[in-house]
Amino acid sequence: MSFLDSYRKKTQMPSTDEALPGRAQPIPTSTTHFVNGRPLKGPWPEGYKQVLFGMGCFWGAERLFWQVPGVYVTAVGYAGGVTPNPTYEETCTGLTGHAEVVLVVYDPKVVSLDELLTLFWEEHDPTQGMRQGNDIGTTYRSVIYTFDKTDRDVAEKSREAYSQALAGRGLGPITTEIEDAPELYYAEDYHQQYLAKNPNGYCGLRGTGVSCPIPLAQ
């Protein structure tokens, strides 16, 4: 297979027929957060909210959010594709359709979705399509998956605001996918809180240098 064919394969979403079959049972993973000891899969305190962010390699993205005051817990996983219960190796082939994502569970009385979105937009490049820097493939695409209509509206308004800011600097267009949250498949144990376990590990986050003009009124 030529380099061009390999690139095309990794950057095109697979059809249902092309996607890997996956498996019926979830892959083994952690139940508690390595940094704060809180439950990765709930239950979480009443009134707390969730959002899924994809912004390239999930190692650095997860660390970014677990450090935010008001964020209760984070976890990494795969979402937005076809293959049920995929492994990391399967996801990297581009034949699952999933993006690497970070689940962020937060207390909206302490940190707002707008504040989380500001971090999301400023800490990666949302104009790169099916890649993030040197990381190439559908798994590294920019995504926001929300759990209710109000949050989706907030996310879409923030995309519009940041798109205008980027255009003012000659950048864009934004390729970030904003959708209702699909099923999250938790990643393997060694990926959870990876940079806490491996402080010198790879972190590919790099923004555009353009500030995001939010928070917006909710």
UniProtKB/Swiss-Prot annotation:
> What is its EC class?
oxidoreductase
| EC number from the UniProt entry | 1.8.4.11
Q: Does the keyword Oxidoreductase apply?
A: yes
Query: What GO biological process terms does the UniProt entry carry, in alphabetical order?
Result: cellular response to oxidative stress; protein modification process
Oxidoreductase among keywords: yes
Can you name one GO molecular function term for this protein?
Answer: peptide-methionine (S)-S-oxide reductase activity
Any one annotated GO CC term: cytoplasm
Region span, Disordered: 1-28
Superkingdom of origin organism: Bacteria
Q: Which residues form the active site?
A: 57
- Give a Pfam family name: PMSR
Keyword annotations of the record: Oxidoreductase
InterPro entries of this UniProt entry? Answer: Met_Sox_Rdtase_MsrA_dom (IPR002569), Met_Sox_Rdtase_MsrA_sf (IPR036509), MsrA_MetSO_reductase (IPR050162)
* Disulfide bridge positions per record: none
Matching entries from SUPFAM superfamilies are given as:
Peptide methionine sulfoxide reductase
Task: State the reactions this protein catalyses.
Answer: L-methionyl-[protein] + [thioredoxin]-disulfide + H2O = L-methionyl-(S)-S-oxide-[protein] + [thioredoxin]-dithiol; [thioredoxin]-disulfide + L-methionine + H2O = L-methionine (S)-S-oxide + [thioredoxin]-dithiol
The family note in this entry says: Belongs to the MsrA Met sulfoxide reductase family.
Name the NCBIfam families for this protein. Answer: msrA
The record's function comment reads:
Has an important function as a repair enzyme for proteins that have been inactivated by oxidation. Catalyzes the reversible oxidation-reduction of methionine sulfoxide in proteins to methionine.
Descriptive protein name:
Peptide methionine sulfoxide reductase MsrA
UniProt source species: Brucella anthropi (strain ATCC 49188 / DSM 6882 / CCUG 24695 / JCM 21032 / LMG 3331 / NBRC 15819 / NCTC 12168 / Alc 37)
The gene it comes from is msrA
